[in-house]
Swiss-Prot record:
InterPro entries: Asp/Glu-ADT_sf_sub_c, GatC. It catalyses: L-glutamyl-tRNA(Gln) + L-glutamine + ATP + H2O = L-glutaminyl-tRNA(Gln) + L-glutamate + ADP + phosphate + H(+); L-aspartyl-tRNA(Asn) + L-glutamine + ATP + H2O = L-asparaginyl-tRNA(Asn) + L-glutamate + ADP + phosphate + 2 H(+). GO terms for biological process: glutaminyl-tRNAGln biosynthesis via transamidation; regulation of translational fidelity; translation. GO terms for molecular function: asparaginyl-tRNA synthase (glutamine-hydrolyzing) activity; ATP binding; glutaminyl-tRNA synthase (glutamine-hydrolyzing) activity. This is Aspartyl/glutamyl-tRNA(Asn/Gln) amidotransferase subunit C. Heterotrimer of A, B and C subunits. Allows the formation of correctly charged Asn-tRNA(Asn) or Gln-tRNA(Gln) through the transamidation of misacylated Asp-tRNA(Asn) or Glu-tRNA(Gln) in organisms which lack either or both of asparaginyl-tRNA or glutaminyl-tRNA synthetases. The reaction takes place in the presence of glutamine and ATP through an activated phospho-Asp-tRNA(Asn) or phospho-Glu-tRNA(Gln).
Length: 106
């Protein structure tokens, strides 16, 4: 059998760092999938790329975004959108905090 690259405990640890919770069944499903993905990366790392120029993007297109200009929104549309939000505050959609500022890194 091939050497184990990743185990369920490691998958659980990474999941907790990402603030994800997996059931034991999900861990059993994801662990071999991640094992396979890591194996694919290991296979790619064996490819000789000598002479291949470094690439940071697959396209020559850059800065294709629109100009950043504030425009007044349609108030009726805004109200309709906010009506669908579970919680709002001061005309904005209120979402739960996702960044832990306790400083413990967990």
């Amino acid at each position: 059998m091939a050497e184990e690259r990743i185990n369920a405990e490691q998958v659980q640890h990474v999941a907790s760092l990402a603030k994800l919770e997996f059931t034991p069944d999900q861990l059993a499903m994801f662990t071999p999938q991640l094992e396979k993905i890591i194996g694919m990366f290991e296979e790619l790392s064996t490819v000789d790329t000598t002479g291949v120029p470094v690439t940071s993007r697959m396209s020559d297109h850059t800065n294709t975004l629109r100009e950043d200009v504030a425009v007044k929104s349609d108030e009726a549309l805004r109200e309709a959108l906010l009506k669908n939000a579970p919680e709002t505050a001061n005309g904005l959609i209120k979402v739960p905090a996702i960044i832990d500022e306790s400083g413990d890194g967990e």
